[in-house]
Each structure stands twice: as structure tokens, then as C-alpha cells.
Amino acid sequence: KMQNVPKAERQQRVLEAAKLLGLEDFLNRKPKALSGGQRQRVAMGRAIVRNPQVFLMDEPLSNLDAKLRVQTRTQIAALQQRLGVTTVYVTHDQVEAMTMGDRVAVMSDGVLQQVDSPLALYDTPKNLFVAGFIGSPAMNLIDGTVVDGGVQVGDYVVPVAREVLDKAPNETTLTLGIRPESFSLGEEGIGLDVAVVEELGADAYLYGTLTGADHADVEDASRQIVARISSRRPPQHGEQVRLVIDPSNVHVFSQETTERIS
């Protein structure tokens, strides 16, 4: 109305947006009579009727409960695909970023860390911050000592190519990044003292600490190791197991620069 848009066109735009958002039956209701998800769709409708070239959404789901957040997230993603409008979506929830974004920009303290597709961020994180931020559960970040042939973690040497080690010639310790699903149970590998087992049917998550870790490591959640195991008979609390690692799935990070060098 303030833009001198004719009344008939205003009504048409409102009806089109309401139909798109599934709000036709709520046009005569006051905001206080709407649910949280419906109010969120009304806010989107206000933007749609302006025919924008770009949407900017700043934490749009932060006030919704978990179930409604998932439902609204899928609605926003479907709507964006239908409209084909470039959308800049700001969020602290990495699940929202990974599931909704075509490209994701990861920032820390206002500094851009990496811009890439969700899969590239997951598979090839640029540094320790991105590695620890993307993924749920997060990537395991394990400190180890540089030795001949790789990096020693506990009593096991994780194979690392010489050309990778040569990229950090002055460092005696490096950080290994390993996704929970990159582990499997075997006879040789990193020793794990199992503290908690989460059985999910076909899979199970093992939470524990490196075998031989001191008391401080056991109490420190940041030192915890998480492994996703495909087994209907997973190890139990208190057991010691060996986690086998495919060297091709190991990320190596410099502790001086925090950059990935593998």
C-alpha cells in the first residue's frame, strides 16, 4: 500500500503467498491466534509479496521447539527451491546449514574460515575449527606424536605419508581428525576404553577415552572419542576395544597453524 500498489494486485499477491505457504485458512486470524510455525510462515509471506531478488533470514527458527524446527526447516528449503530466489541464511545450527545450504560459509569470531558445499566442508575441512564444527557427532580430534611412518596415538602408530609429515617439519606433535564413521572394530588399532554405548539398531555409538589415558582425560569431554560401529552386538561399558582406521580417512592438522596439511 505504501508503494502505491493497486489494491487488486495487493490482494492477489497476498492470496498467492498464502497458498504457497499453506495459510489460506488463517488470513483472518490475529497473530496471537497463530502457532509459532504459522507466525514464521506469515513473516516469510510478508517478504514474498514484495517479490524480492534476495531473501535474508537471520536465525528464523531459533524460537521454535525441536519438532517444529525440523518441520519448518524442510518447508523453507522446499519454498526456496520453488521460488528460485537467492537466500542468505544465518544460523548457529550446523545441521540447518548443512541440510539447507547449497554453499556454506563458516565463520569464527567474524573471520571467514571456509566457503564450500556442505559435502566438501564435511570431507575436506580447511582447519581445526571447521573440522570440529561440522558434523554431528563432531570429528574426533586426537593429538599424537610424530614418529617414523606416521603419528603415534597411545601404543598404535597411525600411518601418515612422509610428504604430509614434511609439511610440518618443525612440529613434534600433530592433530589427527577422524570421523566417527571412519572407525571399525578389529585386532589392531587405537585402543579405546568404552564408557558409554548408544545402541541405535543397526548402528551403535561408542563413547570413551584412549586406553591408558590419565584421569584428566577421562573427565575432559573434549578428549572423548566417539566411534560409530555397524554392529548389532556392540561392546559394552567398561570393555577395551581396538578401533581400526583407514588411513585415507584420516585428516592431519598442524598444531601451529591449525590448517589441514593432508
PLM segments and residue spans:
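ABC ATPase nucleotide-binding domains
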Residues: 1-129
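Generic, ordered loop/turn and secondary-structure boundary motif
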Residues: 3, 27-28, 69, 99, ...
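C-terminal boundary and immediately downstream tail of ABC-type ATPase nucleotide-binding domains
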Residues: 124-147
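N-terminal hydrophobic alpha-helix used for membrane targeting or insertion
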Residues: 17, 85, 132, 220-221, ...
